[in-house]
Amino acid sequence: MSRSVKKGPALCPKLMKKVEVASATNQKSIIKTWARWSTITPLMVGLNVGVHDGRRHVPIYITENMVGHRLGEFTTTRNFRGHAKAEKVSQVK
């Protein structure tokens, strides 16, 4: 479900300060953030953002197609390692 237009986009103030500084100085370093709920704005296009997945910061390069989505949509928080394999038993009749 999308957010109400009346409320505006969900933005983290600390992240937006870091983005403004990075875009003004053409900084190419990764901006670390824990705000997975924050919406990607056009100001972030071309920046590298490290989004926390619960264990580490996953680097993401922001493109124009990502504008309007949340940062957390581009990192997975769960790793599927596969189901346990059943042992093969020879059937002799």
UniProtKB/Swiss-Prot annotation:
GO terms for biological process: ribosomal small subunit assembly; translation. Gene3D superfamilies: 30s Ribosomal Protein S19, Chain A. Protein S19 forms a complex with S13 that binds strongly to the 16S ribosomal RNA. Belongs to the universal ribosomal protein uS19 family. One of its GO terms (molecular function) is rRNA binding. It comes from Dehalococcoides mccartyi (strain ATCC BAA-2266 / KCTC 15142 / 195) (Dehalococcoides ethenogenes (strain 195)). The keyword rRNA-binding applies. NCBIfam families: rpsS_bact. The lineage of its organism: Bacteria, Bacillati, Chloroflexota, Dehalococcoidia, Dehalococcoidales. This is Small ribosomal subunit protein uS19. One of its GO terms (cellular component) is small ribosomal subunit. PROSITE patterns: RIBOSOMAL_S19. The keyword Ribosomal protein applies.
